[in-house]
Amino acid sequence: MSPMLQIAAEEMENPLIPPIPELVIGLIAFVIVFGFLAKKLLPNINKVLEERREAIEGGIEKAEAAQTEAQSVLEQYKAQLAEARHEAARLRQEAQEQGATLIAEMRAEGQRQREEIIAAGHAQIQADRKAAASALRQDVGKLATELAGKLVGESLEDHARQSRVIDRFLDELDDKATTAEATR
């Protein structure tokens, strides 16, 4: 072949289509590499992908379980908080009732003590009045006896006579005091 023909023949070959022997060798090499990868590498890849899928699904399940548990804990917390508020309100109400009862008891005790003090004061005043009246009666009786003895001119040493004169004199004084008060 002439060099020109050779160049023309080379030009006729399509550079995109490889020669058949290269195509066969490439195809055999591809099948060998693909077979090797399918036997050795593909199971490992599938295993890793399956583990990742299970881990992701397990993570999702764990997240859902954690969310459910968190929701449950939140509801328990809210229930406990509501119960604590109710208990606090009950204790506050109890304290107010006890305070009102204590105030009422203290007022009643104060009223009772006041009444006792007033009664004791009245009794003391009455006793003092009787003692003063008795002392006054004796003093007035002595003075009246002395005056009556001077006026009558006789001695009123006799106790019975002295008592009659004193009683009569005091009765006259009481009558005069009563009529003086009535005229006012």
From Swiss-Prot:
> InterPro entries from the xrefs?
ATP_synth_B-like_membr_sf, ATP_synth_b/b'su_bac/chlpt, ATP_synth_F0_bsu_bac, ATP_synthase_B_chain
Subcellular localization, as worded in the UniProt entry: Cell membrane
Q: Which UniProt keywords apply?
A: ATP synthesis, Cell membrane, CF(0), Hydrogen ion transport, Ion transport, Membrane, Transmembrane, Transmembrane helix, Transport
How this chain sits in the membrane, per its record, is: Single-pass membrane protein
Q: Which GO terms describe its molecular function?
A: proton-transporting ATP synthase activity, rotational mechanism
One Gene Ontology cellular component annotation held by this UniProt entry: proton-transporting ATP synthase complex
Q: Provide the transmembrane region boundaries.
A: 16-36
Q: How does it assemble?
A: F-type ATPases have 2 components, F(1) - the catalytic core - and F(0) - the membrane proton channel. F(1) has five subunits: alpha(3), beta(3), gamma(1), delta(1), epsilon(1). F(0) has three main subunits: a(1), b(2) and c(10-14). The alpha and beta chains form an alternating ring which encloses part of the gamma chain. F(1) is attached to F(0) by a central stalk formed by the gamma and epsilon chains, while a peripheral stalk is formed by the delta and b chains.
Q: What family does the database annotate?
A: Belongs to the ATPase B chain family.
Q: Which NCBIfam families match?
A: ATP_synt_b, PRK05759.1-3
Q: What does this protein do?
A: F(1)F(0) ATP synthase produces ATP from ADP in the presence of a proton or sodium gradient. F-type ATPases consist of two structural domains, F(1) containing the extramembraneous catalytic core and F(0) containing the membrane proton channel, linked together by a central stalk and a peripheral stalk. During catalysis, ATP synthesis in the catalytic domain of F(1) is coupled via a rotary mechanism of the central stalk subunits to proton translocation.
Name used for this protein in its record = ATP synthase subunit b
Q: Which organism is it from?
A: Streptomyces coelicolor (strain ATCC BAA-471 / A3(2) / M145)
